[in-house]
Each structure stands twice: as structure tokens, then as C-alpha cells.
Amino acid sequence: MRQATLYRYRLPVDAGVALRNQRLKSRDGLLVRLHEDGREGWGEIAPLPEFSHETLPEAQEAACRLLAQWQVGAAPAESPLPSVAFGLSCAQAELSGTLPQAANYRSATLCNGDPDALFQVLQSIPGEKVAKVKVGLYEAVRDGMIVNLLLEALPDLHLRLDANRSWTRAKADGFAKYVNPDWRDRILFLEEPCKTRDESRAFARDTGIAIAWDESVRDADFRVEAEPGVAAIIIKPTLTGSLQRCRQLVTQAHQAGLSAVISSSIESSLGLSQLARMAAWLTPGTPPGLDTLMLMQAQLLRAWPACTLPLWGEDTLDVVWQG
């Protein structure tokens, strides 16, 4: 007998969690739980405001419809809404035992704040130092100076940078001007520096700074292929789609000689733990980009190793559908 429950959650986040044009006051999403023959599987459906095309109410409506089909024994078609496709596929994979338990919790450290604070955080990273720094929020020249300062101060540091398509080509060049050419190879990649792919390609060609595709991966016309100056693709499953779709992209990237990085869309600790399992399974040896739990004020159902945030249980969830 099949049983399904859809819950809604609301997690408080730290003040000042900025998206593109707004600040998050809470992280709202859905959890799905499937039961069948004594087995259980969970998944998270959490569209990210300003990044997901679907809203949370739209995702909830679609999930309820698909769960009703599943509950009576059907095999529902994959949802066209990425967050719904991802969450349901995770729940089904846990139910069937096809999502391996092994997880890669060693994420690239997400760095925010002033350079002195960043230096202290980065200096304390044990072993290989891989960190992610958001750029494009301030002046490009300032970003270039800070990146240069960090690379100069920490010779064993490698950086992933993310500009979210925020720069014109002129601003991107202003950033590069302040990064010592001798240290640019320690920038593993800069995600989408410019507003268009062609400008980003030209930037990589002219500066020697490798780039990665992030937003482009979700464009309808995107194809995974080897290109000069392109080092990686970033896969954010909540924004991309089902486990099967993500696995397909990883395979295509590896066949093209590119790295694939599993990355967070500010999911709860439950969703993040599933992303860590995906990373260990699909991209072993590549640190995922999952260091977003520090933005939360609580964990949800499943604890992240060594995290000291309080763990919220099922009593904090609201049931929105059951069958």
C-alpha cells in the first residue's frame, strides 16, 4: 500500500541573506514523504525566489497532483517544474534504495564579509583550501583587489568565484586588471562573469581566467560541450530538475572534459544532505558547493555533521496534503 504526505516548512534565516533584488526573511519549502511496503523516502521541493521559474504555490499544486497519481499506483510523468521533479525523484530514489547513502560533506567554503574576516576563515580550512567567493555585489575593481589579496596571502588557496551575470564586459575587465596574472590559474573558475555567454567566452580568452556555466545550464538552448576557457558546469538540482536530469548533465560534462559541481539553492539540512549524497555518487573528488547552512537558524529533520544549529522535527511541519 502506498502512502504519501506533503508538508510545508518555514525556516528562519539570518538577517541579510540577499538574493538578486530582495532579502530572504525565511526559507519556505515543501517536504514530501513516501511510504510503501515498510520503506520510506523523503524529498525537498523548495523553489528559490528570483531564481526558480515556479513559485511555491505552483510547486505545491503540481506536487499534490502527482502524489495523488502515485498514491493510487500510477507512475506519474516527470514534472516540468524543476523543484518538483527534483524533490519527487529524491523521495522515490530513497524509497527504492537507489540514492547511495555515502555523502561528501566537504564543501567549498562560502565566504562573505570583509577581507580580514575572510582571511581568518580561509586560513583555518584544513587540507586543500577551496573556497567560493561571491563577486559582482560591489564594484568590480574592489572585487578584483580582494581576490588578489586573498590569493597573495594564501599561496595554497584555490577560488571559485560567482558573478551571476552581473558585469558588463568593461566591468569584468576592471576586475581582471587587479588580479595578478601569475595567480589567475588558482581561480578554478569564475561563474558567468558577463551578461551574455559570448562576452563571458571572450573574457576567458582574453584574461586567461577560466569560466563556468551556471545560469546557462538551465537555458533551453544550452548544450554541454568543450570550449576554450570553460572549466566546469554548475548543477543546482532544485533549479535543474530530477536526479535523472542531473545525472545526464554530469555524464555529458565528464565526457566533454569538464568538471561538474553539485551546488545548493539554499535548501534545508534535509535537502543539503541529499545533495551531499548526490555529489559523492555522481561527482566524486569534486567538492560540492553546499556551504549554505550557515545562512539558516535551524536544521530540519536530518542533521548536518558537526553543525550546532538546533534540529527541528516533524512537529514544526504543516501537513498540506495526505493520501
Swiss-Prot record:
EC number assigned by the record: 4.2.1.113
Keyword Magnesium: yes
Classification via Pfam families: MenC_N (PF21508), MR_MLE_C (PF13378)
Recorded metabolic or biological pathway in which this protein acts: Quinol/quinone metabolism; 1,4-dihydroxy-2-naphthoate biosynthesis; 1,4-dihydroxy-2-naphthoate from chorismate: step 4/7; Quinol/quinone metabolism; menaquinone biosynthesis
Key words of the record: Lyase, Magnesium, Menaquinone biosynthesis, Metal-binding
Record's catalysed reaction(s): (1R,6R)-6-hydroxy-2-succinyl-cyclohexa-2,4-diene-1-carboxylate = 2-succinylbenzoate + H2O
Cofactor(s) of this protein: a divalent metal cation
A GO biological process held by the record: menaquinone biosynthetic process
Residues noted as binding Mg(2+) in the record, renumbered to the chain: 162, 191, 214
Active-site residues, as the UniProt record annotates them: 134, 236
GO molecular function, one term: O-succinylbenzoate synthase activity
Family: Belongs to the mandelate racemase/muconate lactonizing enzyme family. MenC type 1 subfamily.
Function: Converts 2-succinyl-6-hydroxy-2,4-cyclohexadiene-1-carboxylate (SHCHC) to 2-succinylbenzoate (OSB).
Annotated PANTHER family: O-SUCCINYLBENZOATE SYNTHASE (PTHR48073:SF2), O-SUCCINYLBENZOATE SYNTHASE-RELATED (PTHR48073)
Protein name from the UniProt record: o-succinylbenzoate synthase
Organism: Edwardsiella ictaluri (strain 93-146)
Lineage: Bacteria, Pseudomonadati, Pseudomonadota, Gammaproteobacteria, Enterobacterales
Gene name as annotated: menC
